Amino acid sequence: MAVTTFLFNAIMMAYLGEAGVSAITIVLYAQFLLVALYMGFSMGVAPVFSFNRGAGRYDRMRRIFGYCLRFILVSSVAILAVALALSGVVVGIFSTPGSPVYAIALDGFRRFAPAFLFAGVNIFSSALFTALSDGRTSAIISFARTFGFLLLGLLLLPRLLEVDGVWLAVPLAELLSCLLSVWFLRRKRADFGFGGGDLPRHGGRGGGRI
C-alpha cells in the first residue's frame, strides 16, 4: 500500500504538481467510499458460506453463490452509474467546486469510474475463498488487485498515456484481477460445490432451505 501510494503521489506531482496529488487523494477516498458496499456485503456473507460448507450443505452454497453473483453484478452497474451521474457531488464532498483541485479530480474520477464494474467481483471472491479456508487463493487475488496489477499499471500506463494513465491504472488492475478471480472460481468450483454434477462430500446432508 505504501509503495503504490508513493508512486501515485510521485507521478501526479511530476505531471500536475500539488493539485494533482490532492486530486488523486480525493479520487482514492471516493473509491473507498463507494466500494465499502462490497466490503460490507462480502464480510456479511462469508460466515454463511463457512457454516454451510461445514454442514455439507453444498446445495445451499450453490444457491447463495448465485444470489451473491447477481447482487454483485447489479450493484456494480448501479455504482458505476451513480459514480458517473453524480461524479460532481462525490468529488464535491472532498473539495470545493470550481477549484483547480476539484476540476482535476472530477476529470480523473470519471476516467477512474470503470474500476467499480470489476471491484465487487474481486472483493467478493477474495472474501469467499477466505471463508472456504483457501487463504492462498484469497491472498493471490488480494495481492494482485492492490499491488501486483496496480504496480504494473502505474509503471506502464503513464509512459503511454501520461496523466490519463494514472487514472486508468486502477481500472486496469481491477479488470485483470477480475479475470483472475473468474479463472479461480471456475477452476475451483467443483471443489466447493459451485459447479454442476456431483456435489462434494463434507460430512453433512444436502437439501433443505435457507
Which residues fall in each region the model found?
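Alpha-helical transmembrane segments of multipass membrane proteins
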Residues: 6-11, 33, 124-128, 151-156, ...
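Transmembrane alpha-helical core positions of polytopic small-molecule transporters
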Residues: 1-2, 39, 119-120, 146-150
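Short alpha-helical transmembrane segments in multi-pass integral membrane proteins
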Residues: 49-115, 156-210
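Helix-terminus/linker motif at the lipid-water interface of multi-pass membrane proteins
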Residues: 2-33, 51, 89-98, 159-160
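Alpha-helical membrane-interface segments at transmembrane helix boundaries
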Residues: 21, 31-34, 102-110, 145
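Membrane-helix interface segments
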Residues: 19-20, 135-137, 162-163
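Small-residue-rich hydrophobic transmembrane alpha-helices
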Residues: 9, 23-81, 85-87, 119-141
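Small-residue-enriched core segments of transmembrane alpha-helices in multipass membrane transport
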Residues: 29-30, 143-152
